[in-house]
Amino acid sequence: MSGTGGTAPGTGATGTLAPDRDAPVSLAPGTTSRPASSGGAGRLLDDGLVGLADGVASVDEARRADGSRVLSLRLHGGLHLDVLPDRGLDLGAAWWAGVPVAWRSPHLVDPGPGYGWEERFLGGLLATCGPDNIGAPRGASGQHGTHHLTRATDVRWWRERDGDEVAVHVRGDVGHSTLYGTRLVVSREIVAGTGTPAVEVRDVVRNDGHAAVGVPLLYHVNVGAPLLRPGARLLVDAPPPAVRDAPPPGRSPLVLPDPAPGAEAVVAEHRPRTPVARLTGTGHG
């Protein structure tokens, strides 16, 4: 998904501050916001079968060997997801029902400033491009911009009861500024709940500068094996895609090819008529 827009100076909404991260799930005795099902995480808590909220929705904080922070969410129902505060609150490794779904790069660590996008790109379920640039380097802006390589501040997380399920919210701010120019803040909230494979990313871009500025954003979603396998086909209601470079003979930008040494990337732009796309022929239906 991608989009380009603008924001006027001094405008933008801010999210509601979260309660204390260690606060229990709030629910009056015997009440739910929607009918409960027998297998939901909330029902397990209500019946006393699980004594603590982190028994159905846990969040573990850790640091990797390079010092970067990771919030690992494990949710009743099968979703396991890493949130990366030091990479713009993007999404790292992800599993559903024990099956890895995110593509991850073979790089062991980010080598740091001075290297290009491809050397620093670690993959993960989501890498956000922008808000200063998307695509090839342009002017002083490097390939795909700075969001994915910028640390989030004021990061916090909390749990909320949602009917018979429990949702984990992670929130933080990612700043993009120059000394005498642009001052943008991307306020991001990630929501993932028990009982569903969905994860929601809510972004609000605020312009704290003194002039209107364009804000290109591209959400670089990376799905990989074993969920995605050679032969998988993208189904999208769209005109024929525009490709950056002509693909090799017999290769379609809509079909994942077999692995081949030295194969070049095929970059295609799809302009769907509806905001829905499907993958068929994957390793798991």
Which role fits each region the language model picked out?
Residues 15-200, 212-214, 223-229, 236-260, ...:
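Surface-exposed acidic/polar loop and edge beta-strand patches at domain peripheries
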Residues 202-204:
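Residues within well-ordered beta-strands of beta-sheet-rich folds
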Residues 208-210:
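Short, acidic/polar linear motifs in exposed loop/turn regions
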